[in-house]
Swiss-Prot record:
Forms a heterodimer with timeless (TIM); the complex then translocates into the nucleus. GO terms for cellular component: nucleus; perinuclear region of cytoplasm. Essential for biological clock functions. Determines the period length of circadian and ultradian rhythms; an increase in PER dosage leads to shortened circadian rhythms and a decrease leads to lengthened circadian rhythms. Essential for the circadian rhythmicity of locomotor activity, eclosion behavior, and for the rhythmic component of the male courtship song that originates in the thoracic nervous system. The biological cycle depends on the rhythmic formation and nuclear localization of the TIM-PER complex. Light induces the degradation of TIM, which promotes elimination of PER. This is Period circadian protein. It comes from Drosophila tropicalis. PANTHER family: PERIOD CIRCADIAN PROTEIN. The keyword Repeat applies. The keyword Transmembrane helix does not apply.
């Protein structure tokens, strides 16, 4: 009796099966042989095995190949005992034939070896001893099977822990796996924005590409845009006016487009480094779109002299209602406003081109409406005038 759970139902029924068999007193024995003689022959065969191999009957029976698992103990023992009674029924009645019958039931190997064992009467002490041996044997097998399963569970748990260690978060996987060419917001949030300052001695003027709208006047922005070639596009406000959504403005600004092309050619001939280290918002690695992929209404803006890095988030310009009346005009505020850079204009530059285009072509901007614009570099003169008047 142990606190461990028994491995099978047959272990619980083993003693019960033995008692049930001996209490049934099978009628197969002949009349001249009394049933105790049959029982003594069975016990003599069992004790003969015990004396020869120091194993209990079912243990020896299992070792000789009768039943390989504990689940077959009861059926094996029943077959074993019925074979003994049948051989006794054959009329031989000796312990030798009983053993041969036992060998037949147990695999045929044990019949000849234990024929010389003396018959032992079946007593209660022998049965108790046999039961104790079988209980120890069963518990030993049960512990072994549990030990094997426990080792397997430990191994599987260790393997799972190793897999977790191998695939766990390493030093580079703290915030998830990043894509190859992307830049996170963390690393570049505090970096200064690099402005591309142009040479003031060039023919296109010294306006930086990243325009500071709040500190520049509308007239200087128009001139700077016409010279830089970012706004050489701006030189054609007719072409730039196509940003308002008017379909025919591309054709209207074609005359100014020639001036734009001349200004951009002049800009490229001056040898100014246009596409230097441009590091602008946002910090995502946005692919540099070629100028041909820009909207057709803004082809005057994106000339071949530079390749803009378009923003993921479009820039919105808001024109208040109070300034909308003066927004198309190219009025010059007081010249005391601070400018970021000195502007040197060449003789071939026409600073009045964008103003004339803005005056000849009325811009249909609605007051109080947000207008998106696809480029970071190009600022519409109407929006520039509105912000300059503030």
């Amino acid at each position: 009796s142990s606190t461990e759970t028994p491995p099978s139902y047959n272990q619980l029924n083993y003693n019960e099966n033995l008692l049930r068999f001996f209490n049934s007193k099978p009628v197969t024995a002949p009349v001249e042989l009394d049933p105790p003689k049959v029982e003594s022959s069975y016990v003599s065969s069992a004790r003969g095995e015990d004396a020869r191999s120091t194993l209990s009957p079912v243990q020896g029976f299992e070792g000789s190949g009768g039943s390989g698992s504990s689940g077959n103990f009861t059926t094996g023992s029943n077959l074993h005992m019925s074979s003994v009674t049948n051989t006794s029924n054959a009329g031989t009645g000796t312990s030798g034939t009983g053993n041969s019958g036992d060998g037949g039931g147990g695999g045929g190997a044990d019949g000849t070896g234990s024929g010389a064992a003396p018959p032992v009467t079946l007593t209660e002490s022998l049965l108790n001893k046999h039961n104790d041996e079988m209980e120890k044997f069963m518990l030993k097998k049960h512990r072994e099977s549990r030990g094997r399963s426990g080792e397997k569970n430990k191994k599987s748990a260790n393997e799972a822990m190793k897999m977790l260690e191998y695939s766990g978060p390493g030093p580079g996987h703290g915030h998830g796996i990043k894509r190859g060419g992307s830049h996170s917001w963390e690393g570049e949030a505090n970096k200064p924005k690099q402005q591309l300052t142009l040479n003031p001695s060039g023919g296109g003027g010294g306006m930086p590409l990243l325009l500071d709208i709040t500190h520049t006047s509308s007239s200087t922005q128009n001139k700077g845009l016409a010279g830089v070639g970012v706004g050489g596009a701006g030189g054609g406000v007719g072409g730039g006016g196509s940003g308002t959504g008017l379909g025919g403005n591309g054709n209207v600004g074609s005359g100014n487009g020639n001036n734009n092309q001349a200004s951009t050619n002049q800009y490229t001939q001056s040898g100014l480094p246009c596409t230097q280290n441009i590091n602008l918002w946002p910090p995502f690695s946005v692919g540099i779109t070629t100028p041909t992929s820009v909207l057709s209404s803004h082809t005057a803006v994106a000339q071949s002299s530079f390749s803009p890095q378009h923003s993921l988030f479009p820039t919105f310009y808001y024109i208040p209602a109070s300034i909308a009346a003066s927004s198309p005009s190219g009025t010059n505020p007081s010249p005391n406003r601070p400018h970021k850079h000195a502007h040197v204009h060449s003789s071939s530059e026409k600073p009045s081109t964008s103003q004339a285009a803005a005056a000849t072509m009325p811009l249909q901007y609605m007051t109080g409406v947000m207008y998106p614009h696809p480029s970071l570099f190009y600022t519409h003169p109407a929006a520039a005038a509105a912000t300059a008047m503030v």
